[in-house]
Amino acid sequence: MKTTAERVKYMMMTLKIKEQTEFGLLCGASKSVVYQWLTGRIKSIDAKYAFKLEDSTPFSARWIMLGEGKIKK
């Protein structure tokens, strides 16, 4: 998965999350920010969100931000 949008969609699908608001709660992002990740308007996920996601999900921050390394920690 090369794009942020692909990675966010994959995480939401894997975690069985359907609402952007619910995904945002995992990392402290607003629904608007999650929407912009999903549509490609924001091309990358800031470290502050990635590390919060790493803390609350099985996904690694490096993979969340860059699409590199192991998907799961």
Feature annotation, model-predicted:
Residues M1-K18, E22, L26, R62:
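A short, Lys/Arg-rich alpha-helix, primarily the initiator
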Residues M12, L38, Y49, T57, ...:
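DNA major-groove recognition helix of helix-turn-helix
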